[in-house]
Amino acid sequence: MNSATTMSASVLNYQILKFFPPQKNGFLKSPLIRGKICRFCVSASSNELNKQVIEDPKEETQEKSDGVIVNSTEEEEERSGENSTSTGPSTVLDNKELKKAVLKTASTFAPRASTATKNPAKPGTVLYTVFEVQAYASMLIGGALSFNLIFPSTEPDIWRLMGMWSIWMFTIPSLRARDCSKDEKEALNYLFLLVPLLNVAIPFFLKSFAVVWSADTVAFLGMYAWKLGWLQKER
């Protein structure tokens, strides 16, 4: 009897297993586990989305910062351009101020008329010619004295000293006394201030009257060529 029941039970179990085979991954295929796995996948995907959303603003901020940097560089270039354009008027103002200072200094120390009268030494008059002859004659005589050709001496004396200063004492004042053009007057004003500086500075390096007179002559010709535009006219 027992053997019959055991055989019937085994046959029943075999039929049950035949119709319902055991699932190897039954634990993973249970609805509870499936729900947890789905939740885990959803949470993982949502974290990735959050990371992407967080990373995108960083890229946008970088792009914005790059744009700010570009804009700042453009602003700096514009400012530098404005500064470069603003240097032009400043140099013009500096030149005007320099001319005013030179004119004021020269008019203060150079000989001038005591009263406000018209200059009679106009071009074509006898007085105009006298001033010109006096100016260039004093320059030539001063050169001869500086080179020790007139009143020669072996030692420095008053004649050679006067020859060294002849351009500043006689030539420039005689030319300024004429009714000359504005450019020539400006050149003479510059020379009236430049020649004393040369006469004082050169003897510290070369104690020679001839060298000082030669430097004054070169400065005289160079200033006239610059202010009157001799080189430009030749070109």
From Swiss-Prot:
GO terms for cellular component: chloroplast; membrane. GO terms for biological process: defense response; hydrogen peroxide biosynthetic process; positive regulation of defense response to oomycetes. Residues 1-43 form a transit peptide. It is a multi-pass membrane protein. The chain crosses the membrane at residues 131-151, 158-178, 188-208, 211-231. Keywords: Chloroplast, Membrane, Plant defense, Plastid, Transit peptide, Transmembrane, Transmembrane helix. It comes from the Eukaryota. It is found in: Plastid, Chloroplast; Membrane. The keyword Acetylation does not apply. Its main location: plastid. The keyword Cytoplasm does not apply. Residues 53-92 are annotated as: Disordered. Disruption phenotype: Susceptiblility to the late blight oomycete pathogen P.infestans. Residues 53-66 have a biased composition (Basic and acidic residues). Disulfide bonds: none annotated. Plays a positive role in the immune response to the oomycetes P.infestans, including induced oxidative burst and enhanced expression of defense-related genes. This is Protein RESISTANCE TO PHYTOPHTHORA 1, chloroplastic. It comes from Solanum tuberosum (Potato).
